[in-house]
Amino acid sequence: MRRIRLNLQNAINEEKLKEYVSEVEQINTKMNNLSLEGFEYLGWKDLPENINKNEIDKIIETANFFKKEGIEVLVVIGIGGSFLGAKSAMDFIQGNYPTKKNMEIIFAGTSISSTELTQLLYYVENKKFAINVISKSGTTLEPAIAFREFRNLLNSRLGENNAKRYIVATTDANKGLLFEMAKEKGYARFVVPDNVGGRFSVLTPVGLLPLACAGIDIEKLLEGAKEANALYKNSNLLENDAYKYAVARFLLQKKFPVEMLVSYEPNHMFLLEWWKQLFGESEGKQGKGILPHSAIFTRDLHSLGQFIQDGSKIMFETVIWVDKPIFDLKIEKEIEDLDKLNYLTNKSLHQINKAAFEATVEAHTKVGLVPNIILELEDSSEKTLGALFMFFERAVAMSGYLLKVNPFNQPGVEVYKSNLFKILEKK
């Protein structure tokens, strides 16, 4: 079942895709044979089929334990892929202001801001909270600092022996600082798989435990990913929309060094952030790659719209449109009509939003000459999001290999870390 429809008619001449059929087939075969650079991190591509049922049961049991214990807030501590996947999924499925009463999920360890961490500690001070700390090694500075502070707060309130019941570590299977700490202190543990990099980890316990605690059906999420995987593992470029997207981007980057991912739903903001990390870290190396940028329309049409329409031609857009939103609202007629909006009577807000989407695509492509790739999503369900995660992950792997870079490492981020530790005189 296709939950995502790709439209390239306003972006490229689709005949050009045929020139890459052979290369894409070769790359796909090598990915399947684990014979490409970075093969040791290809575990994500078969996650929906291979994830352990016992692990899913354990995740759901942990979420149910927290609910039974009356946990009001789960503090998820992690940075980058250790929080963006879960946060993006919660907002995508439930909206920015969830209407159902579920355990609240907050995220810490995403910065070194003293104000941010202090306010988060104050926020949970009088609430019953649990901690899910996520780090492969346990040495990443931002989550390590946050974990120390929240751990100390929980220990001071409950005593260390009782507090450990409400701390879960998602980390390496058998090594690392966090693994050793969790083992020594008796924290429950989930595993970050060795063959799955952080930015690809949303369908592992890294993303699944926070999502289960938030009341999201993680089995449906995985089911949607599994359905999509059957489509996106196809080596035939002309039948594989994820690979078509990758090739379209590859063609466009020859002229446009920036890609702006756009959505007309504000609750997709963290989906766009997740996508930026996925593509930015996977492609941006050896002086190559497309700069990933993002915008929420119609909001950002009132700030960036002028530049996109009339500014320097450095970008193409990939636009996400959702056919069926979480909620819709109909405009009712008012007798006085002081705001002169009665011409919209009986139109739904989603209809108006779609008109804005169509008008903007036409303006940007026909007048502004900005290529637009359209991704039309069926709805905001778990299954659709699972499919979208696999779509982007398959696409970025192919895109990286087309650029002749390893999509699964990120050597550039080590430079600032090394400098930081020198300044802090870490031995």
Swiss-Prot record:
GO terms for molecular function: carbohydrate derivative binding; glucose-6-phosphate isomerase activity; monosaccharide binding. The active site is at E281, H302, K417. Its EC number is 5.3.1.9. Keywords: Cytoplasm, Gluconeogenesis, Glycolysis, Isomerase. GO terms for cellular component: cytosol. GO terms for biological process: gluconeogenesis; glucose 6-phosphate metabolic process; glycolytic process. Pathway: Carbohydrate biosynthesis; gluconeogenesis; Carbohydrate degradation; glycolysis; D-glyceraldehyde 3-phosphate and glycerone phosphate from D-glucose: step 2/4. Its main location: cytoplasm. Pfam families: PGI. It is an enzyme of class 5 (isomerase). It catalyses: alpha-D-glucose 6-phosphate = beta-D-fructose 6-phosphate. It is found in: Cytoplasm. InterPro entries: G6P_Isomerase, Phosphoglucose_isomerase_CS, SIS_dom_sf, SIS_PGI_1, SIS_PGI_2. Belongs to the GPI family. Catalyzes the reversible isomerization of glucose-6-phosphate to fructose-6-phosphate. This is Glucose-6-phosphate isomerase. The lineage of its organism: Bacteria, Bacillati, Mycoplasmatota, Mycoplasmoidales, Metamycoplasmataceae.
